[in-house]
Amino acid sequence: MEQKAVILDEQAIRRALTRIAHEMIERNKGMKDVILAGIKTRGIHLAKRLAERIEQIEGNPVIVGELDITLYRDDLTKKTDNQDPLVKGADIPADINDKTLIVVDDVLFTGRTVRAAMDALVDVGRPSSIQLAVLVDRGHRELPIRADYIGKNIPTSKAETVMVQLNEVDQNDLVAIYEK
């Protein structure tokens, strides 16, 4: 794949997450009874960064959970018995019933990953509401899903790929478009 353009560098990612944190606080009246749930892998790290910013602003910690939605994906081919992944589902260190859950992911594309994340959450409990925060929304939805908080809208063609790199995983903070 050939890199076409850098969309967000480290500073732009930091600014986008700070803005999203402020929007979350404003919409959720100080983040009382709110839990962030990051979708594995990069969504978890983004959720942790958002929680840190919210705590800096509000002075109160925010609970962060993890969603591993491998089992729930409808677009993954069946694995052989020897290659079954270890599936955790939702690992949220608090009761989600009657709480506001904010699902955090790096890129919103077709909406299938978010739908799978909501399926995993409903298996754990019944939140009062579910919101969605993404670093990048690239369009091309196949399901009626939209983000409540968006770092950057990046219209792309289906022949392009948006790749998010984060220090915690990739030793670099960067969002770029690649040609397939």
Swiss-Prot record:
SUPFAM superfamilies: PRTase-like. HAMAP family: PyrR (MF_01219). Keywords: Glycosyltransferase, RNA-binding, Transcription, Transcription regulation, Transcription termination, Transferase. Homodimer and homohexamer; in equilibrium. Regulates transcriptional attenuation of the pyrimidine nucleotide (pyr) operon by binding in a uridine-dependent manner to specific sites on pyr mRNA. This disrupts an antiterminator hairpin in the RNA and favors formation of a downstream transcription terminator, leading to a reduced expression of downstream genes. Also displays a weak uracil phosphoribosyltransferase activity which is not physiologically significant. It catalyses: UMP + diphosphate = 5-phospho-alpha-D-ribose 1-diphosphate + uracil. Disulfide bonds: none annotated. This is Bifunctional protein PyrR. A motif (PRPP-binding) lies at residues 101-113. It holds the Pfam family Pribosyltran. It comes from the Bacteria. It comes from Bacillus pumilus (strain SAFR-032). GO terms for biological process: DNA-templated transcription termination.
